């Protein structure tokens, strides 16, 4: 019995041990699974976290908050009844600016109920059909090979693109350089040609139209009539930029009042005329400058809003206008170059002589001497109108970098220009500050320096040098750029800015007469008919006087006096046939005279006489020397 019980106890213990081992192995396996699960997933262990119980009050509060979304009366979908528009089913997608064709994809509107019935298998089949139909295309830009082939066949592409540009819509106006609107020259292969065409466009853009010329003519007529009403013996003449067609939009008009008495340049006359113009509504913003070297009246004509400068008893400006018109007629490219330089200085406020800037006449003389002395123009190597870009860069380089302002001056005449040594003309450098200044000899007065008021010449020189740098850098930059990056760019815009009102490209100077030029020509024609009684006195001939050329007086014939008769000659009024002279002809001719001519004998030559002793001593001395 005991043995059986002991055996039973042993078997029970062994069973317990086996069960403990199996439990341990199961626990180890379970712990390994939990470790692997914790490594592979970020979910927390189920045994490690305790479930947090929520209070009943909090649960009811949450239920009330979510109950709001179950109320269909307050929250109804307003877009349930809207139908999908058929026009929106197709959508155009532009892949790239350089692509010739755009890819069109069809996007169908599908309701939510229909999408719920679509299974994953149908989506896979739709993708497979798209691949089979080649509808999965994605557009990219041109490859390198296509770009290379495009560059090789560039001429044909440029022609097609130019045709497209001509038929395209107008380009938007650029506020800084509006003269390039619808005038794109970026297709020019030579940068110099591009700049030349742009200069011509700018000149055409700022040239006056018919309305502007008529506005100035009317304003000038009103002022002239007022001056003649106030002073019957006076007349108004125009000079400066308006009398030479070299004025910018909005520039002033320079006028001069000349009278027969010549006494209208005093202080009393200036204030009297200014008051008269203001009372009659012909002048606003009146300013009388009576203490200046050249007294003037500055005012604004109210009808045209044009600024007018009125001087008195001077004719040099009218004479200069005639000379400048002759230069413009004989020098191609002068007008274009002058207008560019004027606008360049105007934008930098360097064109006002009262603050040391460069005046209009000085600018014209600089441009005229530059063109007359340019070596390639002298040799007829280039045509000025076809090389305005190169000439503009050369102009800025000459007067901004190379011109010797300390030693060199400029002399201009009616048909020629030259450089002069400033030291040889002390009258031109009198009362100037230092040696670094600009000297331009007046073509009408050789002792006058027309640029003596331009004391700010250092800033002007720096501006010219900067313009040269800007233009050359811009030319190199655009020359290296592709044609795509040239579109809409401007070379001249680097140095020229126009901030005025929008204009058109109508140069209508040939359609209407400029009254200032016409009256200036008539003035010189009348001056040519003046009879000079004295160097300082002239006879003024008006337009109403009839001028007739008198034939020169015939010279009276004066009879020559009769020669006096000789003493031995008797003059008979009616000689007879038996006339015998007082002396025979043979005696008069000396035929009977004897030949008593005895020539004087030739005098013998005086030869020096030496004695024998002297000769002997001479030859002895010669022998000793030998």
From Swiss-Prot:
The keyword Cytoplasm does not apply. ATP binds at residues 317, 342, 448, 452. Its EC number is 2.7.7.19. Residues 18-37 have a biased composition (Basic and acidic residues). Residues 1-62, 590-626 are annotated as: Disordered. Coiled coil: none annotated. It is found in: Nucleus, Nucleolus. Keywords: ATP-binding, Cell cycle, Cell division, Magnesium, Manganese, Metal-binding, Mitosis, Nucleotide-binding, Nucleotidyltransferase, Nucleus, Transferase. Residues 1-14 have a biased composition (Polar residues). This is Poly(A) RNA polymerase protein 1. It comes from Eremothecium gossypii (strain ATCC 10895 / CBS 109.51 / FGSC 9923 / NRRL Y-1056). The lineage of its organism: Eukaryota, Fungi, Dikarya, Ascomycota, Saccharomycotina.
């Amino acid at each position: 019995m005991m043995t059986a019980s002991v055996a039973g106890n042993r078997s029970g213990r062994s069973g317990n041990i086996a069960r403990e081992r199996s439990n341990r192995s199961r626990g180890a396996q379970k712990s390994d699974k939990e470790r692997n699960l914790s490594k592979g997933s970020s979910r927390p262990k189920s045994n490690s976290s305790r479930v947090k119980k929520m209070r009943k009050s909090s649960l009811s509060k949450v239920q009330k908050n979510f109950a709001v979304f179950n109320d269909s009366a307050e929250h109804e979908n307003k877009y349930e009844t809207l139908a999908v528009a058929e026009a929106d089913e197709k959508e155009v997608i532009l892949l790239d600016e350089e692509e010739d064709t755009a890819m069109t994809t069809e996007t169908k509107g599908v309701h939510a109920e229909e999408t719920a019935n679509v299974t994953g298998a149908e989506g896979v089949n739709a993708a497979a059909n798209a691949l089979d139909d080649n509808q999965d295309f994605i557009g990219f830009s041109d490859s390198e090979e296509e770009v290379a082939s495009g560059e090789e066949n560039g001429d044909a592409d440029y022609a097609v693109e130019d045709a497209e540009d001509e038929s395209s819509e107008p380009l938007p106006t650029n506020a800084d350089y509006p003269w390039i609107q619808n005038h794109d020259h970026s297709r020019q292969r030579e940068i110099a040609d591009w700049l030349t065409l742009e200069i011509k466009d700018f000149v055409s853009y700022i040239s006056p139209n018919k309305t502007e010329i008529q506005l100035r003519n009317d304003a000038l007529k009103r002022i002239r009539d007022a001056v003649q009403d106030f002073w019957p013996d006076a007349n108004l003449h125009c000079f400066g930029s308006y009398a030479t067609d070299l004025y910018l939009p909005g520039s002033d008009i320079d006028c001069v009042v000349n009278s027969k008495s010549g006494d209208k340049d005093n202080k009393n006359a200036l204030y009297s005329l200014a008051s008269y113009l203001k009372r009659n509504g012909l002048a606003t913003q009146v300013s009388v400058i009576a203490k200046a070297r050249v007294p003037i009246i500055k005012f604004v004509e109210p009808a045209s809003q044009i600024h007018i400068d009125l001087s008195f008893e001077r004719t040099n400006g009218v004479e200069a206008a005639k000379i400048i018109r002759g230069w413009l007629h004989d020098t191609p490219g002068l007008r274009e170059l002058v207008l560019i330089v004027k606008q360049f200085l105007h934008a930098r406020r360097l064109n006002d002589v009262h603050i040391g800037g460069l005046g209009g006449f000085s600018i014209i003389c600089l441009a005229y001497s530059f063109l007359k002395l340019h070596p390639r123009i002298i040799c007829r190597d280039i045509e000025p109108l076809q090389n305005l870009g190169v000439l503009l860069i050369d102009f800025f380089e000459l007067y901004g970098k190379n011109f010797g302002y300390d030693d060199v001056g400029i002399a201009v005449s009616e048909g020629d220009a030259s450089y002069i040594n400033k030291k040889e003309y002390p009258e031109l450098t009198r009362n100037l500050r230092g040696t670094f200044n600009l000297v331009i000899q007046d073509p009408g007065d050789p002792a006058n320096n027309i640029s003596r008021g331009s004391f700010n010449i250092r800033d002007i020189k720096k501006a010219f040098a900067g313009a040269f740098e800007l233009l050359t850098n811009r030319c190199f930059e655009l020359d290296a750029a592709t044609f795509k990056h040239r579109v809409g760019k401007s070379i001249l815009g680097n140095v020229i800015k126009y901030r005025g009102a929008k204009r058109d490209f109508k140069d209508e100077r040939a359609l209407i007469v400029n009254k200032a030029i016409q009256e200036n020509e008539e003035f010189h024609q009348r001056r040519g008919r003046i009879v000079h009684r004295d160097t300082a006195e002239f006879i003024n001939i008006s337009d109403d006087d009839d001028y007739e050329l008198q034939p020169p007086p015939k010279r009276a014939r004066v009879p020559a006096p009769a020669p006096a008769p000789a003493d031995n000659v008797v003059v008979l009024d009616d000689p007879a046939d038996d006339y015998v002279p007082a002396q025979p002809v043979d005696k008069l001719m000396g035929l009977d005279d004897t030949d008593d001519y005895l020539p004087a004998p030739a005098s013998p030559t005086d030869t020096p006489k030496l004695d024998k002793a002297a000769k002997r001593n001479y030859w002895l001395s010669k022998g000793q020397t030998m």
